[in-house]
Amino acid sequence: MPKIKKVSYILAIVLSVIYLLWRVFFAIPWHAHIFTLIFALLLVGSEIFSSFTAYVLIIFRLIRADKTQKLEIPEFDLQQPIPKIDVIIVTHNEEVSLLRKTVNAATFMDYPDKSKVNIVISDDGNRPEVRELAKEYQVNYVTMEKNKHAKAGNINNALEQLDAPLFAILDADMMPFSNFLTSSVPFFTENFAELEENPDHTKPIGFVQTPQSFYNADIFQFNLFLQDAVVNEQDFFSRDVNVLNGSNGHALFTGSNAVFLREIVDKVGGFPTDTITEDFELGTKINSEGYISIATREPVSSGITPVDIKSVIKQRTRWARGVIQSCRNMHIFTNPKITLLNRIILINTWLYWWSFSRRLIYIAAPLLYALFKVQVVNANFWILMIVWAPGYFLLHFVLGDTSSNIRNERWGESRKLSLLHICLFQLFWNQSGSKLRNLR
């Protein structure tokens, strides 16, 4: 990274911190009406948490820039044993025509010894037509009579009948490219060799997460006819943020397109069944046992993202409530098994879902002043501009620079704002301890 860019990144944080210190010590209306004071404190808290999430991204970019930019996929060392791998295609009630595409794509995956690739359709619906599909493509079929634990139960049932040292998880709609295995398994074979040579200074890899990629337009691209103008809304996390997480050894598991070391999944008790986001919680458990996780940047599979509002609401509700629920299950603030870096990543993920409530506060603050003359910042306009503007604009310039061409910040904020009403109630409801199983 060029030195001038590093200076701008650091300066953005310094100016932003100066502004926040001014806000806390000089701009809170302590003698105002109780309602005004409470809202002013909520606004300051929102600004602090928003800045924290930005600082994490910028600092990770500063200290890990070279590592993420030079992330290279190792090649198979044919002098080393090629491990067996189970490829589990998870299905519940998806159409067979959709599942057929994924199964067909899986049969064309490259591997040095294809006899060591075991493709399995794990169908908790026990459907005869899916069984016939497995026979047609000469892959294995696993089913169960009654599944009480949704996707996690389906995968756990399949794992009980499999024994390869590695396994991959694919959703029913997620078609793997031919290089899916050759872009993920070599990380493990290289790690196995390093563990043999230097076990005291090498951490084992628990899983490798490849990006979530979609061949259809997302709900925003589709309805606003912006397929060629903006990228898919999930690209920024999958191909940027999670790669940064992985550069620190703590990539998040996002539910599909990942390859796992079987022994650590068994060690943590399989896929968690007491959460609606078993993916997020499983990845956290694996990291808490001292195993690292890696995220790659280039897509090696492609699936379908929902484009109707009903499906999007259900999806985001499940994500929001599930992450909050899993963070509570894992005690991310106090769990001694979670390292400092991993804790920062998890807290940052937790705070992301609370960003919807922060946006509501940001919208309300100027409206309160415009309509009711409620002043929640104890400062005149020009002092506010002098202290706030330099840090704000430089910070947002830096955030835009760190996102490269994967993310447009303005579109990102617009998308989040449109989902505010969907997620806000769910967050408060689930933070109180309530659960919602039928979102699976």
Where are these regions (language model features)?
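Membrane-embedded multi-pass helical conduit in multi-pass membrane proteins
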Residues: 18-47, 352-437
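Short aromatic/hydrophobic "clamp" motif used to bind/position activated sugar donors
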Residues: 167
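Catalytic donor-sugar/metal-binding loop of nucleotide-sugar-dependent glycosyltransferases
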Residues: 274, 284-301
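N-terminal membrane-anchoring/stem segments of glycan-assembly enzymes
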Residues: 1-79, 134, 356-359
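Short, acidic, metal-binding catalytic loop of nucleotide-sugar glycosyltransferases
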Residues: 102-116, 191
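Long helical/loop segments within the catalytic core of UDP-sugar-dependent glycosyltransferases
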Residues: 145-160, 164, 178-276, 287-288, ...
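A conserved acidic beta->alpha catalytic loop
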Residues: 122-130
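Cell-envelope/extracellular polymer assembly enzymes that use nucleotide-activated donors
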Residues: 83-86, 118, 281
